[in-house]
Amino acid sequence: MMKPATPHAIYSDIKSMLITFIISIAAGLICQYLGLPAPFLLGSLFGVWLIGGAVAPIRASLGVPRWFHIPVVLGLGTLIGGNFGPDIFTHMSSWAATVIAMVAATILATLAGLFFLIRIRKYDFTLALLSCIPGGQAEVIVISRDLVEKDYVVALFHLVRVALVFCSAPLILALMQGQDAVQASNATLLAMPSIFALPPATLFTFAAMSIIALPVARFIRLPMPHLVGPLILSSVLHILGLVEIPRISEFVILAQLTIGGAVGARLAKVPFLDLAVYIRDAFASAIIVLSTYGLTALALASWTGLNFMQLLLAFIPGGLYEVTLLALIFGFDIAFVAFHHTLRVMMVFFGLPFIIAKTRNPT
């Protein structure tokens, strides 16, 4: 629930944002200089978390207000929808077998993760589902903020999984070449078109789609309307070829700072000993999920004769940009890898809100 719009509340929100974003930007730039993957997401999360945890006087002032967070989510949903294009159905027909295998692996990985977290570790269903679902870390963190109290736990699970993928995939593929992929990933992020390089019509279309989608989604009672609404609208318009919205560099960085900073602020207010058990569970869950995808890729490669490494990169949930760039470095079919990752993420984010809504309101 948003704070009342009093002068004091507005001042408090702006103060929190300034402190949080100053730390987030500084930490993000350091991570970028060090060549880490997703530097502004990891930098903002860990920077705000560590500094907030160490410096008690600013701890209570950290955070990102909801009135700022929601517009960022609206724009993020629009950009996610832009991953689908008019050629989506052609790809689906030519890659039918691998798509079916990827969908099956996603279901199996999710069920295996749920079994471990619910039956063995006794997690609540919603927290367990959000923690083990093999989707994009930033988007799941966005969703979790509205659904669970411990969204920082969800963030930990996904950060651990992505870190394991990015550290292990290069070793599996070609020993020590992973750093090349990290550098290429960061170069791709920097090469995204700037907001100042785009025509006003494109920016207007981006803003209009993001804004219009929210009331429409609320009117037709979509779950999580601020994310699902623009995601569906953007997907449909991109598939029909009516619009083409690129990933806007400044907005992608802003989304990373907002999401990472918000989660880092919450982590800073939780004692580390309370997090230790979740970190252990996150490693176990990540191994279960990644092993499921790896075994599926191995079985399909044995059956069809397709390249195991290419299938592994196409299936394994380790970040669209990072894994796609690993495919580029090692000479695999980039479209194949990117398509399967995009489809998996879209599958998760179209299905997840409805699954949660159904389990919360079974009637």
Show where each model-derived region lies:
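Juxtamembrane and boundary regions of transmembrane helices in multi-pass small-molecule transporters
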Residues: 112-123, 165-186, 298-304, 347-363
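Alpha-helical membrane segments and immediately flanking helix-loop junctions
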Residues: 120-160, 308-340
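Membrane-embedded alpha-helical segments of transport systems
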Residues: 135-140, 154-177, 292, 320-322, ...
